[in-house]
Amino acid sequence: MSRHKSKSIPGRNLRLAEQIQKDLAGIIQREIDMTRAGLITLSGVELSADYAHAKVYFTVLGAEPDTAAALLNEKAGWLHSQLYKLLHIHTVPTLRFVHDPQLERGIEMSMLIDRANRGPHSGVPDEPEDQS
């Protein structure tokens, strides 16, 4: 899923955002030791109208989002140089990685729906009670 704001050439913006997302995902998977950062999935790229800046949205499992964001942003310059080698465009955007909480929100919503569907008379407790 690519996010784009630009009205200038929306098709190009969308294609470029998707290509950046695809290429970055491959580079991160092959080239960066992400053991400290958990399992990272790139969920979207939002390009500025002039293509100079890109917000790269990610989700993470198995680690704190702040840890993953710090590691990705620390590697942003190197990732930019790797993208430059792959993309055949004049300006490769600077990268800023931002945690995308959509996955967590989706899980929370699913739990709320399940709880509502169980109803008050289902005999299944909503939350396990703390015995301490």
Swiss-Prot record:
Q: Which GO terms describe its molecular function?
A: ribosomal small subunit binding
Q: Which InterPro entries match?
A: KH_dom-like_a/b, RbfA, RbfA_dom_sf
| Disulfide cysteine pairs (residue numbers) | none
Q: Please give the HAMAP family that the UniProt record associates with this protein.
A: RbfA (MF_00003)
Question: Key word Cytoplasm present in the record?
Answer: yes
State the UniProt keywords alphabetically: Cytoplasm, Ribosome biogenesis
SUPFAM superfamilies this protein is in?
Ribosome-binding factor A, RbfA
Query: Which family does the entry's similarity section mention?
Result: Belongs to the RbfA family.
What's the protein here called?
Answer: Ribosome-binding factor A
Question: Which is a Gene Ontology cellular component entry for this protein?
Answer: cytosol
Q: Could you describe the subunit structure of this protein?
A: Monomer. Binds 30S ribosomal subunits, but not 50S ribosomal subunits or 70S ribosomes.
**GO BP, one annotated term:** maturation of SSU-rRNA
Describe the task this protein carries out: One of several proteins that assist in the late maturation steps of the functional core of the 30S ribosomal subunit. Associates with free 30S ribosomal subunits (but not with 30S subunits that are part of 70S ribosomes or polysomes). Required for efficient processing of 16S rRNA. May interact with the 5'-terminal helix region of 16S rRNA.
